[in-house]
Amino acid sequence: MERVETRKNPNDRDPVSVKTTRVIPSGTGTDKIPVNADGHPLDPAEYRLRLEGLERALALIVDNNRAQREAMEKYARRRKDRNEVIDATRNAFLFTFVGHELRGDRVLEKYEMWPNPAFKATSRFASILIRVHGYVWIDENAGELARLEGEVTEDVPFGLFFGKIYKGSHFLQERYEVQPGMWQPTFSQYDFDGRKLFSAFSIHERSSYSNYRYIGPPKEALEVIRKELGRADLNNPDSRAAGR
């Protein structure tokens, strides 16, 4: 499940909105179905309709439908672009070992990261990286990213200089091993302020992620969704096996 809290200001105690959704891979992205804080459907009838729509989309993928195949190819390109961004991140910073920290019974290696002066930004996202200072924590045994925190050190222009992300914008992400060998985000926080054209914008979100379940590639996921639809009581969270 994904719970997103939105605040007007980062230090506000109470959020102005809270949205909880069940996130299910669709083969061409993810489908987010609204639920309440306990994971129960807000509207069981609407919940079933959304699952039936997901079932149809997965069935088209399994049957090698042309439109869905093209959508999958587009999704694969987006993932490739994301992986290239991750690779760029490795080159965009210089890392200095700070020390070890404990998180529960796990040992984390902490590194400070500074912009690499030799790095040449080739995309809008990369242009942000060269203006970020922060820290990363690596799980010593698993070699996986456990925590990431950074702050924008100077204003970042975007959109042909009609927009700007302001200095001091901040981000944080916590990651845990949710299943053996599978590390996923469990919490993220984004506090970004800036302007676009002549309007100011603020993004202050705290997101938590829980109840991860692996449902496999589209063919396996389709069977999981069909089994769930075959159950009588979709309002019982214990009867639902897919999503997170």
PLM features per residue range, with description:
Residues 1-133, 140-146, 151-169, 177-184, ...:
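Structured extracytoplasmic
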Residues 187:
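Conserved active-site loop/cleft motifs that coordinate metal ions or position small ligands
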